[in-house]
């Protein structure tokens, strides 16, 4: 199975036909897709003016989309390296029990779904690397009352997410499933109330 870097080389390889280069970019998303596969593809297509179903898109646009994905991946891999070093130090110091953020991190190792968007068409519009930097800052700074990506305070708890963790707080502004460790307990409680109110309004 080809890795991310091998697939990225195929995307850039002008000897390959455009259908294969597009396919290779889609396969890259099986290795790294911050919003989830479909939402990350929708994001890249929107930002780089690629028709999602076009089998022979402009090669310059394909490469620009890959560049954005690679920049975001570099940001995330650097964070993961620092995270792994921190856990090693903590274990060496006798701190074996992982924190809530560590449990969340285990589910997103590799960067897949790190800022998952439950609806493929609802995702942040900013460049992927910028979104990940905001998220990483929030993970390092501690809990807050607003979405770490767009600062929206209207966050709604959903019980019917399409992917793991299957339930959680969803930002009404940018569409990400907000990692619970970055929200205060009051913000999580408010999101659950908002979720119950939405359910009651459609009952």
What name fits each language-model region?
Residues 154-155, 178:
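Cys/His-rich microdomains that often coordinate metals
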Residues 158-169:
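Short linker/helix segments within small regulatory modules
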Residues 140-144, 166-168:
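Residues immediately within or flanking Cys/His clusters that coordinate Zn2+
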Residues 175-192:
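Short metal-binding segments enriched for Cys and/or His
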Residues 1-33, 128-131:
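Short terminal alpha-helical segments
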Residues 12-20, 35-37, 52-56, 114-122:
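Charged, low-complexity interaction regions
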Residues 147-150, 171-174:
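Short cysteine-rich clusters marking metal-coordination/redox-active sites
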Residues 38-65:
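Short, charged early-sequence alpha-helical segments and their helix-coil boundaries
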């Amino acid at each position: 199975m080809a890795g991310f870097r091998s697939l990225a080389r195929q995307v850039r390889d002008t000897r390959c036909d455009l259908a294969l280069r597009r396919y290779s970019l889609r396969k890259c998303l099986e290795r790294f897709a911050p919003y989830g596969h479909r939402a990350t593809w929708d994001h890249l297509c929107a930002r780089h003016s690629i028709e999602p179903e076009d089998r022979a898109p402009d090669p310059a646009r394909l490469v620009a989309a890959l560049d954005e994905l690679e920049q975001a991946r570099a940001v995330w891999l650097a964070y993961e390296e620092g995270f792994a070093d921190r856990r090693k130090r903590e274990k060496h110091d006798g701190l074996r029990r992982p924190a809530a953020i560590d449990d969340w991190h285990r589910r997103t190792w590799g960067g897949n779904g790190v800022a998952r968007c439950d609806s493929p068409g609802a995702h942040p519009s900013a460049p992927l690397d910028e979104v990940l930097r905001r998220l990483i800052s929030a993970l390092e700074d501690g809990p807050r009352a607003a979405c770490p990506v767009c600062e929206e305070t209207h966050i709604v708890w959903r019980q019917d997410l399409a992917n793991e963790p299957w339930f959680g707080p969803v930002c009404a502004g940018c569409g990400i499933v907000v990692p619970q460790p970055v929200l205060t307990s009051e913000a999580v409680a408010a999101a659950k109330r908002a979720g119950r109110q939405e359910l009651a309004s459609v009952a």
